């Protein structure tokens, strides 16, 4: 598709993502919605106000009422659309730098399917929108944040964090409006980093894509959680200041849920990027791993297809389907705390049980002449695979790059394979 990637529309504001495009997306979505309502939320980016106004103008011009939540995590908008059975729009570029922004469309708690994205694209390409006699209105819906916090607290009503020291890196993003309040309400003592709503600081050297920041800076926390800009990812830090990635979080949750009888079909969904160490660990515990394409929407599709209720990605996108319909960093963090409290164990003890095979990812800038249908490339992949290395080469769904990932047990050999593939792609 021309506009939609693996996580909605995304680009650098003022270049590939403009107010004009946002206005047209609003009109196209408005045609589909009819005379209903759309809940709109955003992260802290400076361009969020402008895009919010543009997409709202497009929606209201088509007779749709718009409920403005302000700064609020993506999973909060998902929950609100599920409760109200309505459409939602999130203005965010998730983990990307501040100059990026994006548009995600949700319906009834879920990101819309590819077919509906294609329908919006078709309307954008046609560019003709019949006038509506009825014009919609924009209304403040700041109580949406309180509804989300209330729902999360109800889910974890039996979780008592009294005496727990927790450190949070809020990435200067959307969880600045929710995470600290929830942890404190549950009794935890909270140390907070990067809680500014200055839109120029979001994800800058902090958050889920820079977990070492929290590992190096946390002072009092027995456990730490670092979120991304829109709050749908989380990475943990243990009491020894080791980073605990999404794969290991999934492994800990899988064992915890299985012990409670909550892990549907003893199955977990991951992606082609899921570390082989997690797969081996789960197999030892009698748990099956299903793999799918990269992207939390594809993880969710596979979960719904297989009946699994736990799935996610190494990046920290983790879906606990009996808790939430989408990846929710806050819910994942609280579920992990619940498993730890129930077991009486430290996070480091759990995490060390899960192997994490060396894995290197390199981004190569994508050019028009670059092709993955390359005989030399095929030979490298086949030869590497025959020696026990796992190779994944794929276009990014959110950035103009080709991602090369190689996994195995010999880091030096992995580095050689990655560089060899890079040379072939760039030649």
Curated annotation (Swiss-Prot):
Record-stated family: Belongs to the phosphohexose mutase family.
The entry's keywords: Isomerase, Magnesium, Metal-binding, Phosphoprotein
UniProt gene name: glmM
Domain of life: Bacteria
Catalytic activity, reaction form: alpha-D-glucosamine 1-phosphate = D-glucosamine 6-phosphate
InterPro entries referenced in this protein's UniProt entry, alphabetically: A-D-PHexomutase_a/b/a-I, A-D-PHexomutase_a/b/a-I/II/III, A-D-PHexomutase_a/b/a-II, A-D-PHexomutase_a/b/a-III, A-D-PHexomutase_C, A-D-PHexomutase_C_sf, A-D-PHexomutase_CS, Alpha-D-phosphohexomutase_SF
GO terms (BP aspect): carbohydrate metabolic process; peptidoglycan biosynthetic process; UDP-N-acetylglucosamine biosynthetic process
Species name: Thermotoga sp. (strain RQ2)
Name assigned to this protein: Phosphoglucosamine mutase
Catalytic machinery residues: 94
Cofactor(s) for this UniProt protein: Mg(2+)
Protein role: Catalyzes the conversion of glucosamine-6-phosphate to glucosamine-1-phosphate.
């Amino acid at each position: 598709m021309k506009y939609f990637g693996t996580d909605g529309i995304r680009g650098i504001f003022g270049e590939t993502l403009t107010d004009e495009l946002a206005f047209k997306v609003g009109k196209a979505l408005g045609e589909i919605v009819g005379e209903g309502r759309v809940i709109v939320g955003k992260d802290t980016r400076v361009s969020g106000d402008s895009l919010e106004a543009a997409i709202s103008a497009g929606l209201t011009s088509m007779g749709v009422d718009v409920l403005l939540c302000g700064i609020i995590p993506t999973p909060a908008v998902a929950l609100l659309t599920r409760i109200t059975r309505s459409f939602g729009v999130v203005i965010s570029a998730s983990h990307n730098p501040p100059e990026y922004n994006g548009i995600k469309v949700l319906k009834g708690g879920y990101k819309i399917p590819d077919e509906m994205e294609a329908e919006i694209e078709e309307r954008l390409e046609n560019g003709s929108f019949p006038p509506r006699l009825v014009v919609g209105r924009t209304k403040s819906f700041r109580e949406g944040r309180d509804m989300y916090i209330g729902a999360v607290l109800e889910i974890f009503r039996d979780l008592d964090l009294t005496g727990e020291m927790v450190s949070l890196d809020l990435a200067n993003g959307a969880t600045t409006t929710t995470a600290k309040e929830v942890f404190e309400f549950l009794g935890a003592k909270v140390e907070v980093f990067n809680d500014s709503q200055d839109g120029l600081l979001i994800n800058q050297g902090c958050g889920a894509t820079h977990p070492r920041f929290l590992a190096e800076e946390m002072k009092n926390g027995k456990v730490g959680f670092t979120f991304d800009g829109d709050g749908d990812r989380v990475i943990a830090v243990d009491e020894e200041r080791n980073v605990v990635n999404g794969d290991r979080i999934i492994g800990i949750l899988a064992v915890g849920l299985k012990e409670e009888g909550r892990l549907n079909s003893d199955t977990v969904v991951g992606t082609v990027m899921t570390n082989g160490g997690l797969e081996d660990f789960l197999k030892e515990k009698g748990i099956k791993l299903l793999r799918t394409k990269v992207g939390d929407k594809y993880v969710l599709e596979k979960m719904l297809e297989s009946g699994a209720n736990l799935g996610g990605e190494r990046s920290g996108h983790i879906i606990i389907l009996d808790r939430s319909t989408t990846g929710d960093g806050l819910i994942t963090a609280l579920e992990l705390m619940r498993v730890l409290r129930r077991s009486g164990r430290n996070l480091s003890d759990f995490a060390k049980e899960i192997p994490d095979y060396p894995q290197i990812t390199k981004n190569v800038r994508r050019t028009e002449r670059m092709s993955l249908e390359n005989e030399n490339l095929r030979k490298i992949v086949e030869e590497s695979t025959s020696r026990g290395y796992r190779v994944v080469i794929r276009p990014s769904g959110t950035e103009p790059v080709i991602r090369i990932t190689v996994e195995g047990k010999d880091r030096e050999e992995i580095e050689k394979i990655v560089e060899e593939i890079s040379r072939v792609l760039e030649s």
